[in-house]
């Protein structure tokens, strides 16, 4: 039975471990991580399904996103708590017209007419708009759902802070394949200097009267089951996880300009975390190695998670067959 190790327990790590377990049935899969849900970067995410802060080949991103959407629909069909309402519609307003190819996987896509734009635009820079329907995941219950399935199927979970990837087998014994799903941690774990943090600060608020998401060039209001996520910042190469009250206030006030009814919102909490950014997603097996990398998803970890997990399964099969491969296009 092949012994598989997955490093990292955010949505990418847990999904990858579960996908391997389900598709390579004789495998023994172990997740090793320092932090687990609800204390991962994934848990802070709003969970809207659309590529965000992810610089990669668009066809590759679309393929991964389609797999994730199919997965979400399966999750919804199982009747999981809150899953029945995991579609939402809203507006994306822009200062410069952009109709990216990934919109083809969204539903009800409509370019706003001049009159429609006037009805929703709140700033002079809102010169172009798109309405569409997408999906979202509440990350914490979803990761729990996956983790429960993983454990029920015989998966193992170990709590450990691994400093270097070479230390894994010193502490836990030999593995046939080791997958790096450590997000920003890959910078230190394997010395990948192309991984860098993009600092994101958000607010969680309650405002039941808001029924649509709203995104513009800088700010966004995204609906969750019981709250709304207001953002945001995207500060590249910033490691500071300290909440800045002035930034929180600006996020709130600027979103109120876009959605005036937010002024009655109840502020629940503020959060800061570091998106694991990279020039391109690294999803590949190192040549002549047992190590596979699956990291650098930027702000799109939720959007891409299941597509990337399925691709990892194929890479694991190649490594086990003695044919490590590279999945770059």
Swiss-Prot record:
Q: State its Enzyme Commission number(s).
A: 1.4.3.3
Q: Answer whether the UniProt record assigns the keyword Signal to this protein.
A: yes
Q: Which cysteines are joined by disulfide bonds?
A: none
GO-annotated biological processes: D-amino acid catabolic process; digestion
What class does this enzyme belong to in the EC scheme? oxidoreductase
Task: Give one GO molecular function term.
Answer: glycine oxidase activity
The protein's superkingdom reads Eukaryota
Q: Where is the signal peptide?
A: 1-19
Q: Which protein family is named in the record?
A: Belongs to the DAMOX/DASOX family.
Indicate whether Signal appears among the record's keywords.
Answer: yes
Name the residues that bind D-proline: 220, 275, 299
Spell out the subcellular localization from the entry: Peroxisome matrix
**Subunit details:** Homodimer.
Give the taxonomic lineage as stored in the record: Eukaryota, Metazoa, Ecdysozoa, Nematoda, Chromadorea
Q: What does this protein do?
A: Catalyzes the oxidative deamination of D-amino acids with broad substrate specificity. Could be responsible for the degradation of diet-derived D-alanine in the intestine. May play a role in egg-laying events and early development.
**Motif location (Microbody targeting signal)?**
327-329
- According to its record, what are the GO cellular component terms? cytoplasm; peroxisomal matrix
Its needed co-factors are: FAD
User: What is the official name of this protein in its record?
Assistant: D-amino-acid oxidase
InterPro entries hit by this protein: DAO, FAD-dep_OxRdtase
């Amino acid at each position: 039975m092949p012994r598989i190790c997955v490093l990292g327990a955010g949505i990418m790590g847990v999904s990858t471990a579960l996908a391997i377990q389900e598709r390579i049935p004789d495998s023994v899969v172990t997740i090793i991580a320092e932090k687990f849900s609800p204390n991962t970067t994934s848990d802070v995410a709003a969970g809207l399904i659309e590529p965000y802060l992810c610089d990669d080949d668009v066809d590759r991103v679309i393929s991964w996103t389609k797999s994730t959407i199919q997965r979400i629909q399966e999750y919804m069909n199982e009747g999981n708590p809150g899953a029945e309402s995991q579609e939402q519609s809203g507006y994306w307003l822009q200062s410069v017209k952009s109709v990216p190819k990934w919109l083809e996987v969204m539903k009800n896509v409509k370019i706003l007419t001049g009159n429609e734009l006037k009805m929703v635009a709140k700033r002079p820079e809102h010169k172009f708009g798109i309405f569409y329907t997408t999906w979202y995941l509440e990350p914490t219950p979803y990761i729990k759902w996956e983790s429960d399935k993983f454990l029920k199927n015989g998966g193992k979970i170990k709590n450990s802070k691994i400093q270097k990837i070479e230390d894994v087998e010193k502490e836990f014994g030999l593995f046939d394949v080791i997958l790096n799903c450590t997000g920003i941690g890959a910078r230190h774990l394997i010395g990948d200097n192309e991984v860098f943090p993009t600092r994101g600060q958000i607010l969680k608020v309650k405002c039941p009267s808001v029924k649509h998401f709203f995104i513009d060039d800088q700010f966004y209001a995204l609906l969750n089951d019981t709250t709304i996520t207001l953002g945001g910042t995207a500060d590249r190469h910033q490691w500071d996880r300290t909440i800045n009250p002035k930034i929180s206030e600006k996020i709130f006030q600027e979103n109120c300009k876009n959605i005036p009814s937010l002024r009655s919102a109840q502020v629940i909490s503020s959060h800061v975390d570091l998106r694991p950014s990279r020039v391109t997603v690294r999803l590949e097996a190192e040549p002549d190695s047992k190590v596979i990398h699956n990291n650098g998803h930027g702000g799109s970890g939720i959007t891409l998670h299941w597509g990337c997990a399925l691709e990892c399964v194929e890479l694991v099969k190649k490594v086990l067959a003695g044919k490590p491969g590279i999945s770059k296009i």
